[in-house]
């Protein structure tokens, strides 16, 4: 957070509202460096795909390059979110960029001497995807550390725009480089792109990571999963992302095959197709901030989905390139419209205590659907004509966008996301081992019997709040001997985690849910905290549990 304090935002008239975060010097440097690095990564993917196309590999193998790049997120996204939450994010990025640089340099040499086999290519792509999966949540969670809170939504959108500009521009450059210099040159340029990002990270020595309460790795992972499980809004947004991505990735997976077999293009022609998509992405970077201010999130995603789907159909059916290329420009713009809008919405909505872990689930959906969509498109293209597969994908994208008319994403504006401290946990010494002991919290509400149902209806919001912030089980009871009492009981994994619920996990919206229920009690709430004590025959298990819990992630290392 120190970086925010040292960087005044430039408010000169030349800065439009959507691009205001670029006035923060370190954000501007990191943003530009990440675009360069991501451009190199997408050049790498296209180079790998074209290497297989040159060898007349099947469409399935070509599509598997995308799958090998994206699939590691399915394995490592959630642990990566925990790592990015508690370790120094700058160091995570330094480490990941260095490893990727070494892998790409090795692959460049093997390709230059003609020794790159399909197995080596796919294995290297998988390793690069694995390291990328580890760094992505840390990078996205870095944004709130370096820009003022009021610019977070715009900064999140700019980060997503940068990623998607790279996704379109990188392949375009790669196609042109392959045509002139070969695939090895593409891999070498990717290596140089990592050096750019490393240079910025080494230059940036003033980063002071935010102080986070250390948590055991397993508990931190469970907390992230529990939050997503009980956050209906986040689940709905991620599901909307999946609805678009699975069919949409047919474009990226099958474009090399369509360029060569259907359009008769060489590598340079393929590069021109990608250049058109890249041009649309650049236009989208300028159009999207304006679009977000004149249309709701659902309107932007709906329009972009329909335009993207129409672009896929035109790509295959257009009788002339004079129609194909403008359609691809619109398709690139529409891609940015969907992905950047959803990313900005998720990043702005996630509370700070679980933001990195929440973004790891976003990456899980993003890359998991990329892997599934690419592999599925490759399988279908091995059975049917690739052009028909792309047309079908375009129709599905359009229908998915139109479904927003009847099933829109939930509105998130006006929902308080700031963290507030909730009173109720006394700051007094606890017996030895109490921090690791499971806790049962029992709260007694006093309310007239005729208002009981009103309280129970209100408790639905309280239930979701408790479960999102760490409760493992929750239940409400009515005292059979005292009809005027309603009892809320929930269990938490440890006293330490229960303190976190009160001091670092409750958002303004959550506090409102709790306050609404408490206000209905006619007397002061009776709150009891019960600490679990293991029975003698469980003590061996409890000792191992305590030892494991002490293996917390040391923040800032």
Q: Where in the sequence are the language-model features?
A:
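Alpha-helical transmembrane-bundle signature of multi-pass membrane transport and export proteins
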Residues: 1-412
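Short, intrinsically disordered terminal tails adjacent to the first/last structured region
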Residues: 1-12, 433-438, 457, 528-532, ...
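Short glycine-/aliphatic-rich beta-strand segments at the starts of folded cytosolic domains
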Residues: 436-448
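Short, glycine- and small/hydrophobic-rich beta-strand elements in well-ordered beta-sheets
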Residues: 463-487
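Short, surface-exposed ligand-recognition loops at beta-strand->loop->(often short) alpha-helix junctions
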Residues: 445-457
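Short beta-strand/turn micro-motifs at beta-sheet edges
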Residues: 427-434, 475-477
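Short, highly charged, low-complexity non-transmembrane loops/tails of multi-pass membrane proteins
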Residues: 414-430
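An amphipathic, aromatic/His-enriched active-site/gating alpha helix that lines ligand/cofactor pockets
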Residues: 466-473, 491-527, 557
């Amino acid at each position: 957070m120190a970086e925010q304090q040292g960087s005044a935002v430039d408010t000169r008239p030349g800065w439009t509202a959507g691009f205001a975060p670029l006035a923060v010097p370190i954000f501007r440097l990191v943003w530009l460096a990440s675009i360069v690095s991501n451009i190199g990564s997408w050049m790498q993917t296209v180079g790998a795909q074209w290497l297989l196309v040159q060898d007349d590999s099947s469409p399935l193998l070509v599509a598997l390059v995308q799958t090998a790049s994206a699939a590691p997120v399915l394995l490592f996204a959630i642990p990566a979110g925990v790592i990015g939450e508690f370790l120094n994010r700058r160091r995570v990025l330094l480490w990941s960029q260095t490893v990727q640089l070494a892998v790409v340099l090795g692959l460049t040499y093997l390709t230059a001497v003609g020794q790159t086999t399909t197995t080596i290519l796919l294995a290297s792509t998988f390793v690069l995807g694995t390291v990328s999966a580890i760094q992505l949540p840390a990078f996205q969670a870095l944004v709130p550390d370096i820009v003022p809170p009021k610019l977070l939504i715009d900064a999140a959108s700019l980060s997503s725009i940068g990623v998607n500009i790279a996704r379109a521009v990188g392949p375009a450059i790669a196609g042109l480089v392959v045509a002139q210099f070969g695939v090895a040159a593409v891999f070498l340029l990717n290596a140089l792109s990592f050096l750019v990002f490393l240079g910025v990270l080494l230059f940036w020595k003033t980063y002071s990571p935010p102080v986070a309460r250390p948590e055991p790795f397993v508990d931190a992972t469970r907390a992230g999963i529990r939050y997503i499980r009980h956050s209906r809004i986040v689940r709905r947004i991620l599901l909307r992302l999946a609805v678009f991505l699975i069919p949409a990735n047919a474009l990226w997976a099958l474009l090399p095959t369509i360029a060569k077999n259907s359009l008769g293009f060489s590598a340079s022609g393929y590069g021109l197709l990608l250049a058109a998509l890249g041009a649309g992405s650049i236009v989208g970077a300028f159009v999207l901030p304006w679009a977000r201010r004149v249309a709701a999130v659902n309107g932007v995603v709906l329009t972009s989905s329909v335009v993207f789907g129409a672009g896929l159909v035109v790509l295959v059916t257009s009788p002339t390139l004079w129609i194909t290329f403008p359609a691809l420009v619109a398709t690139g713009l529409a891609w940015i419209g969907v992905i950047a809008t959803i990313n900005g919405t998720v990043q702005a909505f996630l509370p700070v205590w679980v933001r990195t872990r929440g973004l790891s689930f976003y990456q899980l959906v993003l890359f998991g659907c990329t892997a599934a969509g690419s592999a599925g498109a490759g399988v279908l293209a091995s059975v049917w004509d690739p052009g028909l597969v792309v047309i079908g994908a375009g129709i599905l994208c359009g229908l998915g966008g139109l479904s927003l008319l009847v099933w829109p994403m939930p509105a998130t504006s006006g929902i308080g996301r700031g963290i507030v401290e909730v009173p109720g946990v006394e700051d007094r010494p606890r017996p030895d081992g109490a921090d690791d002991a499971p806790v049962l919290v029992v709260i007694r509400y006093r309310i007239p019997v005729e208002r009981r149902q009103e309280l129970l209806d209100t408790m639905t919001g309280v239930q979701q709040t408790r479960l999102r912030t760490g409760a493992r089980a929750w239940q409400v009871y009515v005292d059979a001997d005292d009809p005027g009492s309603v009892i809320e009981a929930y269990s938490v994994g440890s006293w330490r985690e229960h303190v976190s619920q009160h001091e670092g996990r409750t958002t303004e919206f959550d506090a409102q849910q709790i306050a609404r229920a408490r206000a209905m009690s006619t007397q002061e709430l009776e709150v009891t905290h019960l600490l679990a004590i293991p029975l003698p025959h469980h003590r061996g298990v409890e000792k191992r549990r305590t030892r494991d819990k002490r293996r917390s992630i040391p923040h800032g290392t």
